[in-house]
Amino acid sequence: MPPTNRPPPFSTILSSASLPSYSSTDELTPIYQGAEAHLYKTTFLSPSQPAALKIRPSKPYRHPILDRRLTRARILQEARCLQKLVKEGVSVPALLGVDWEPSAGDGSSWLVMEWIEGEPVRVILEEWEAYLKGIEREKRLGLGEGVQGSEEEKVRGLMRRIGRAVGGLHRAGVIHGDLTTSNLMLRPLGSADTTETIEERDQSPSMAGEVVMIDFGLAMQSSQDEDRAVDLYVLERAFGSSHPRTERFFEEVLVGYRESYKGAVSALKRLEDVRMRGRKRSMIG
């Protein structure tokens, strides 16, 4: 990772080898490091205000002028999408700050966002599928009654909330570009305690909470049905590949989506065309 300046009000320089240690009031915790961006948990303005710091580093293999233009365009696109969605009342991280031309002059750019507490929907569904597998095993051994209807209804409720969240995104004229269950957070309502006791580890995970979409690095502004349908198709494929036991509930996502805004019907019709093209592509290889 190339040296990257920590933006104001941050002052510590990130080393290419490792991150230096910080005091309890000035902590920078690595969360994710990808090819396009690095994500950290930090604080903003106050030690009690957690925030997410996203840095888009420069690419040394690109021409410096082209690199600065691309990095600037992408960070500004992400910031504009977040700002628009917050204004429209969509559940996304609030934008706290952005700098597309830091004074370091190294070609990097950054933005600071609200820190979203909770778990990714991916983790919740993986825990539920593991719980489901255990229940089915007990039933085969004659030790239980199998999955209760309330469990399936709980999953259906979460799927519908996901659909409504995506519908709100599309109603606002924004396309996510990378809709997966890793980019959907389930934020606890109020001050709910998300810590888990030993007795609760083998229980069905809670699915209560607000669905919050994160990571808008590939987002764009569009009201085209084709773009909306592709967004939905990416999410559908994510369920098929990552959550095989939950895939059968994906129709509930579309139910919630259909209820969320007037233009949903035409986007769902286009989804059928996108699915058809996807199947042909899979057959051809």
Swiss-Prot record:
GO cellular component: chromosome, telomeric region; cytosol; EKC/KEOPS complex; nucleus
Pfam families (alphabetical): Kdo
SMART domains, alphabetized: S_TKc (SM00220)
Record key words, sorted: Activator, ATP-binding, Chromosome, Cytoplasm, Hydrolase, Kinase, Nucleotide-binding, Nucleus, Phosphoprotein, Serine/threonine-protein kinase, Telomere, Transcription, Transcription regulation, Transferase, tRNA processing
Protein kinase domain segment(s): 25-285
GO biological process, one term: tRNA processing
EC number: 3.6.-.-, 2.7.11.1
The reaction(s) this protein catalyses: L-seryl-[protein] + ATP = O-phospho-L-seryl-[protein] + ADP + H(+); L-threonyl-[protein] + ATP = O-phospho-L-threonyl-[protein] + ADP + H(+)
Sequence positions that bind ATP: 31-39, 54
Keyword presence, 4Fe-4S: no
Location in or out of the cell: Cytoplasm; Nucleus; Chromosome, Telomere
Record-level Gene Ontology MF annotations: ATP binding; hydrolase activity; protein serine kinase activity; protein serine/threonine kinase activity
Domain of life according to the entry: Eukaryota
Main localization (coarse): cytoplasm
Coiled coil (residue ranges): none
Record: active site: 178 (proton acceptor)
Quaternary data: Component of the EKC/KEOPS complex composed of at least bud32, cgi121, gon7, kae1 and pcc1; the whole complex dimerizes.
NCBIfam families documented for this protein: arch_bud32
Membership in a protein family: Belongs to the protein kinase superfamily. BUD32 family.
Role: Component of the EKC/KEOPS complex that is required for the formation of a threonylcarbamoyl group on adenosine at position 37 (t(6)A37) in tRNAs that read codons beginning with adenine. The complex is probably involved in the transfer of the threonylcarbamoyl moiety of threonylcarbamoyl-AMP (TC-AMP) to the N6 group of A37. BUD32 has ATPase activity in the context of the EKC/KEOPS complex and likely plays a supporting role to the catalytic subunit KAE1. The EKC/KEOPS complex also promotes both telomere uncapping and telomere elongation.
The record's note on its domains: This protein is considered an atypical serine/threonine kinase, because it lacks the conventional structural elements necessary for the substrate recognition as well as a lysine residue that in all other serine/threonine kinases participates in the catalytic event. BUD32 has protein kinase activity in vitro, but in the context of the EKC/KEOPS complex, the catalytic subunit KAE1 switches the activity of BUD32 from kinase into ATPase.
Protein name, UniProt field: EKC/KEOPS complex subunit bud32
Species in which this protein is naturally found: Emericella nidulans (strain FGSC A4 / ATCC 38163 / CBS 112.46 / NRRL 194 / M139)
